[in-house]
C-alpha cells in the first residue's frame, strides 16, 4: 500500500508540475499574442 508520506510526495510533485504547466502555457500564449499583433 501507499504510505501517507509517499502520497504527500506524489501530490506535491503533481501539484508543482501542473502549476509549472499552467505558467508555461500562459507565458507561451502571451508571447504569441504579442507577436501576432506586431505582425499585423
Swiss-Prot record:
InterPro entries: Oligosaccaryltransferase, OST4, Ost4p_sf. The keyword ATP-binding does not apply. Keywords: Endoplasmic reticulum, Membrane, Signal-anchor, Transmembrane, Transmembrane helix. The chain crosses the membrane at residues 5-25. It is a single-pass type III membrane protein. Residues 26-40 are cytoplasmic. It is found in: Endoplasmic reticulum membrane. GO terms for biological process: protein N-linked glycosylation; protein N-linked glycosylation via asparagine. Residues 1-4 are lumenal. The keyword Endoplasmic reticulum applies. Its main location: endoplasmic reticulum. One of its GO terms (cellular component) is oligosaccharyltransferase complex. Belongs to the OST4 family. Subunit of the oligosaccharyl transferase (OST) complex that catalyzes the initial transfer of a defined glycan (Glc(3)Man(9)GlcNAc(2) in eukaryotes) from the lipid carrier dolichol-pyrophosphate to an asparagine residue within an Asn-X-Ser/Thr consensus motif in nascent polypeptide chains, the first step in protein N-glycosylation. N-glycosylation occurs cotranslationally and the complex associates with the Sec61 complex at the channel-forming translocon complex that mediates protein translocation across the endoplasmic reticulum (ER). All subunits are required for a maximal enzyme activity. Component of the oligosaccharyltransferase (OST) complex. This is Dolichyl-diphosphooligosaccharide--protein glycosyltransferase subunit 4.
